[in-house]
Amino acid sequence: AFGFMLPVLAGFIAMAIGDRPALAVGFVGGMIASGGKSGFLGALVAGFAAGYIILGLRKICAKLPQAIEKIAPVLLYPVFGILIMGLLMNFVVEPIMGAINTALNTGLSNMGETSKVLVGLILGGMMAIDMGGPFNKAAYVFGTASIAAGNYDIMAAVMIGGMTPPCAIALATLLFKHKFTKEQREAGPTNFIMGLAFITEGAIPFAASDPLHVLPACIVGSAAAGALSMAFNCTLMAPHGGIFVFPVVGNALLYLVALVAGTVISAVLLGLLKKKVD
């Protein structure tokens, strides 16, 4: 299943740009990236490239006779799209992005303590920026790709960054009840469960109702948790699971400390930033 992550990522990026005909083209590009050296970065490029390849083919096919235009989505788009994608990946994307990806993984393996903490800070914060959106997914896929490269501390920072927002919101609904509506207070405890299970999306309704105050608080707490996870040299070899994979976390006790610290920081900031509900 892990081997399909990059192809699926590339396929759905492509589909978001070029609609359904781009899915197969993006998937093929992601497969080439997954089997080559470009990895996550190559899959990202493949997804965008596939989407725009299909858009280009659509404009070209619009000038063809109507009889040919009707078969374009099922014949011309996939055949020419996959052909172009294969050439692009093998002769352009793989050499360039492969070199960048190799250098990046080497740098991550050899980085000093300060640099590791900074990476954890950034990735943890990204997990809370849009809570399930592009930034969140980019950080998550980078974390899972790092597992394959043997950098298990990165995945630990990513997961803890995603666990923090729901846990923090749940804690804030208990500590600062006057800052939340009755419905939000009732939904608060559920976020504890979702946060511990690494389901960041549980925080979305709270962020959507007050993004200017909720998002900054969650980002700061998640960034702090990610940085602490790196500072404590915590590691994680599983791509998901939340508290259920704590038995395979390296330095699990300190990992829990980092989670509690990030949760408390975000909860306190929520209490300070949010306005009192009438």
Explain the meaning of each model-derived region.
Residues 1-66, 70-277:
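Pore-lining transmembrane helices
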